[in-house]
């Protein structure tokens, strides 16, 4: 971890610890246990200590961790929403999830949903980490993943394909699950599999045919690999513009999840279901504030105060 990131995490830990001491978590907990609110948050590649500590905290404090099927039944008003409902998911399909997440899932017997990016499963790496590792081969203006994310999808794919051709398949260590790994976690009674597209594109940069392919083909592959229906979708990068809805409907998805950090409720659009983003390298205190929808409102308030003071 670089110095800037270390400083950032230390400052955020201090702020989060202060918010906890000031009773923000306690008040939010009372609201979550009282109202028909669903606490929804997701990870990418957490270490085992962070994942276990968050799971244990919610289990020990009277929350109910619900499965994907229970979530859908609650949304469709087939069952009542329990007080303090929590739904947990993970994006991408990182191989380290097998060592850091799955043992905790089995130990605590908690349901989780994995949103899998199929291209990374088949090729071993996620495109943004390959771009970073091979940045010396890119033009200077495209050496940051954010610059590549701004490109039209066809152009981004061409660049990544060129990098694949210029680097041998075994040049980098595998970071994504294998097909057998996906089959294995899908066989666990606690796990549900969802789609995270094929290539993890920025969907608003895609043509209609590209969106159609990303949503349809990833679903088909995951269903072929697992032998189970894939009914939900996670927007890559949390980015969307509304054009995706027609393809979600076409391919039979019943839920699509975002990275909007707030509680979900029974009136939410099923294709814009919110989830708070857990920081893989952040502290427990900061991430508890993220999960319980404390962090974002406070940060927005600070930003408004700073803006008014200028």
What are these regions (language model features)?
Residues 1-88, 95-96, 127, 133, ...:
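C-terminal active-site subregion of NodB/CE4 polysaccharide deacetylases
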Residues 94-95, 199:
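Short, glycine/acidic-enriched loop or turn micro-motifs at the edges of active sites
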Residues 98-111, 148-158, 162, 290-310:
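Electropositive, surface-exposed helix/loop patches at the edges of structured domains
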């Amino acid at each position: 971890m670089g110095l800037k990131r270390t400083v950032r995490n230390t400052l955020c830990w201090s702020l989060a610890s202060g918010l906890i001491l000031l009773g923000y978590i306690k008040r939010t907990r009372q609201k979550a246990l009282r109202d028909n609110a669903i606490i929804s948050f997701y990870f990418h590649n957490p270490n085992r200590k962070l994942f276990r500590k968050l799971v244990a905290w919610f289990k020990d404090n009277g929350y109910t961790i619900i499965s994907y099927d229970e979530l859908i039944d609650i949304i469709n008003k087939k069952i009542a929403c329990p007080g303090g409902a929590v739904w947990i998911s993970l994006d991408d399909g990182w191989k380290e999830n097998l060592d850091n997440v799955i043992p905790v899932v089995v130990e605590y017997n908690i349901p989780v949903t994995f949103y899998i990016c199929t291209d990374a499963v088949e090729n071993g790496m996620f495109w943004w980490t390959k771009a970073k590792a091979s940045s010396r081969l890119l033009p200077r203006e495209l050496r940051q993943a954010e610059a590549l994310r701004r490109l039209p999808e066809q152009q981004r794919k061409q660049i990544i394909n060129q990098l694949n051709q210029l680097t041998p398949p075994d040049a980098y260590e595998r970071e994504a699950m294998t097909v057998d790994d996906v089959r294995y976690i899908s066989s666990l009674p606690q796990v549900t599999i969802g789609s995270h597209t094929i290539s993890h594109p920025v969907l608003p940069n895609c043509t209609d045919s590209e969106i159609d392919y990303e949503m349809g083909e990833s679903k088909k592959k995951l269903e072929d690999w697992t032998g189970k229906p894939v009914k939900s979708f996670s927007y890559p990068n949390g980015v969307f513009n509304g054009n995706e809805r027609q393809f979600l409907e076409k391919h039979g998805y019943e839920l699509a999840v975002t990275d909007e950090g707030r509680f979900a409720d029974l009136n939410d659009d099923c294709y814009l279901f919110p989830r708070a983003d857990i920081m893989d390298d952040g502290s427990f205190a900061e991430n508890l504030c993220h999960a319980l929808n404390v962090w974002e409102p406070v940060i927005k308030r600070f930003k408004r105060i700073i803006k008014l003071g200028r």
